[in-house]
Amino acid sequence: MTSLTLYLIIFSIILYLFVNRNKRKNLKIPGPNGIPIFGNLLSLSGEMHLTLQEWYKTYGSVFSIRMGNIDTVVLTEYPTIRKAFVDNSLAFASRYQLKSRVVLTGAKDLAIQNGEIHSLLKKVVLSEMTTTKIKRMEIHIIKETEKILKILDKHAERGEPFIINNYLNMFSMNVILRFLLGIDYPYENVDETVGYVKSIKSFFAVAGLPILSDFIPIPLKKSGVFFDSYKELEIETDKLIEKFKKSRNEKIENGTYNEEEDESILSKLLKEYEHGNITWECVSHTCIDIISAGTDTSANTLVMALIELINNQEIQSKAFSSIRSSCLNDSNDDDDDDEIVITHSKYRSLLPYISMIIKETFRKHPIALLGLPHVTTEDVEIDGYKIEAGTYIIQNIFSSHRSDKIFQSPNEFIPERFFESSQNQGLIHFGLGVRDCVGKSLAECEIFTLIATLLNRYQFINPNNSKKLNDIGTFGLAQVCPDTNIILKKRI
């Protein structure tokens, strides 16, 4: 880059900021002071959720920050977020489409699309994620559970420490692939999927961090982990889609295709594409959204739940006792107590303590620490503050779940807090309003089934009794869990 080019860029930035200096929004909303050009951006590198937590403690449930030249409001606590995303849902429903994400996907994916196309994509996905459909497809979750048990049994027989993360990633990925494409990967080939899972993790680790060119007028660098990891996801996902299309077309040609029996989400997306209702990019990028989000969020929740159960053995023992006393009397007489798969549809109502453990994991370790960004489409008042149209909105989920105004002893893992149904309303781990998580019912089903079944079958042990397992993840679009080394002991 020549000196003249550099000077022109700097001059352009200064001129742009000078012209826009009097266009600041939300000046009456409290918040930390920023610095020229960058605003508060430089304070938000690294563990961004922890910085926002400190500012929440200082400025309250509604505070403003400046991300470059973009006016931003951060909302914390369930009552405040509900007022915005439920009571004023139309004003807060739209996604803020950052430049980097638009370049990455063309804004063609389910996650950041707005308007009629988003409504259509959501309708297609939700049509295969209803409670009735999930119950009918629960056999796939049962089969995945049985397959992972065979692998974990071998580790239990060896009695040696091993890292469990990849197996849980494989489980979650296979469940979502079953719903999306009607396929899965064998667990014996876990190493073959590590690259795919690694790309998901790499992308999610950086996708939540601010990219300077999204917030200040400088050229976007179309390289680095953000773009490279997504490109890898795109390549691998397109291979799966093409394989699915080939199989589907062959069945159509030879007359063996039964549309009514094809319950995969991709078949419904392809149908909309073939009718000209969506573009091919919508199909491809929405599949990436579903696979990556469905894999990483559920798997990381499972890892965090097991970490807490290992660090709190009394909770693990209580959970095991509740399973043995509450639901196994309901099983067939010829079933061994440690052999059954404890399904969500049959046993959830019989095992309230398992549900409490899962809710407490959602609370203490929300995987989407800040959700996805929204933008206000009209002026709206929240908690006495006027938030202007065009404001970038952050749902401060992590701080909401760790607020002592909402939860007593918020840094402790206490499943019993959910004995009181009122505490359920403090949870916003799946988001709130019309843009909440489309896969929440499936996630709850698979997480309950695996956690309950694993607790019934194994005791989970820390290889190092002198030190608790690390329960602190790192910031990303989805929280990245630490690699977790454990020992399994088969229950007798």
Curated annotation (Swiss-Prot):
Names of required cofactors: heme
Subcellular locations according to the entry: Membrane
Pfam family, one: p450
Organism lineage: Eukaryota, Amoebozoa, Evosea, Eumycetozoa, Dictyostelia
Binding positions for heme per the UniProt entry: 437
Record keywords: Heme, Iron, Membrane, Metal-binding, Monooxygenase, Oxidoreductase, Transmembrane, Transmembrane helix
Chain segments annotated as transmembrane: 1-21
Family: Belongs to the cytochrome P450 family.
EC number per UniProt: 1.14.-.-
Xref: Gene3D superfamilies: Cytochrome P450
Listed CDD domains: CYP1_2-like (cd20617)
Record's bilayer topology term: Single-pass membrane protein
Major subcellular location class: membrane
The protein's name in its UniProt record: Probable cytochrome P450 513A3
Gene Ontology molecular function: heme binding; iron ion binding; monooxygenase activity; oxidoreductase activity, acting on paired donors, with incorporation or reduction of molecular oxygen
Top enzyme category: oxidoreductase
Biological source species: Dictyostelium discoideum (Social amoeba)
GO cellular component: membrane
